[in-house]
């Protein structure tokens, strides 16, 4: 099997380094409008040709390992995870033999994988050595309000050369990740992200060999250099920017060695700005265990895993290929609006080599995984949030027709249960993310689970139930296509504690 893969072009939107992200009608939108008219999109001559893995020399027997970077725990207490994180520019090898000046945590892409358990106290001594301000958002973790990393909402941006101490106690098992929340599309696109796994010591279930797969992409030229933010020009711009180089744990086409019959539990994280992953493995099915916030109520058999930006999936597969056989994990373009599958084909991501037979018979995966009580919404407050896009001289996105910098916060009370109807009448799908709280999708056809990020397909709606049980304060909600959020598709939720003095909501910043 040839180990070169066809790659999608790097998609770009004009980058404006200001508090408000402007999406102007220019070269980037013209190809999109051409597509609507039935014309084939053209790419400006100044746009570098997308780099293909086959263009890079690969040594004989080349196979990257999937080991994630780590960082020392500075605290001897087994119930405390204390680390140092530094955001800095560093040369990293993302493509064989080439150095990329990426934006990194502790000098690696991805950043160090963090692992702890429910009840642990986490202390992060963070230093910002980037040339611009930043923060860290602990995506999915239910942390105290002032630890959430939302600039201008929960904390002041950390200036270049500055530092901040993040400290919180872990309350929920699951697969999480961390990333910036200031100029986030650019900073994430340059390499700032890392995985965070929280385990439940009381959960004795095992599902074979466990592996975290952090999926990302970056825009790189033929020399491994980061492409400028505004070198796009394909129809993909309105879907958000996708880097043309797809990475698994910071590697291009790594190889995983497995044993026939030995179960593999994959914790999958979509750390991209905009790319939807529809994952398939030839002649195999997955058993989905859950996703964002730990195990679902029950397992389900699926033949593909769709993981949208910011979302996570927890799944098991049992290798069934004979020793000496090679398989490939592919992502398949998935329909998420006009032209989302136009001129795109399946791409190889991860090579899987079966090297031996497992000595044991795979354990059956239970149908029932854990008990989850469905939220009682009998007296819940009902809200409707419509995700909107307006195109005139610029592209302005918002919620209920209002961009973030013009919107007023939603206000609720600590202890309240609410039902949110998320309406998407736009021509593009949007992954909806809520900070600070978990929700349940109100759909009898879905497996019951706790989530913080969910896809709202184009021309559809979803109903979510959420209980604001603790941690009062101001929290964000937004589309997790990061360019969409920065174009205005986000809002603020203010959870007030009746027992405390009313807090003033900070004025919203325009670039997150």
Indicate residue ranges for each PLM-predicted region.
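Acidic-aromatic/histidine active-site loop/patch
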Residues: 209-262, 269-273, 390
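N-terminal edge beta-strand
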Residues: 92-118, 243-257, 392-417
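C-terminal motif of bacterial Sec signal peptides marking the signal peptidase cleavage site
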Residues: 35-38
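Asparagine-centered strand-capping/turn motif at beta-strand->loop junctions
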Residues: 126-130, 268-272, 422-426
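Hydrophobic or amphipathic alpha-helical targeting/insertion segments
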Residues: 43, 162, 166-203
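Extended terminal and domain-junction accessory segments
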Residues: 41-84, 188-220, 297-429, 467-474, ...
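Mature N-terminal segment immediately following signal peptide/propeptide cleavage
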Residues: 73-102
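Extracytoplasmic beta-sandwich strand-turn segments characteristic of Greek-key/jelly-roll folds
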Residues: 109-116, 122-125, 138-172, 248, ...
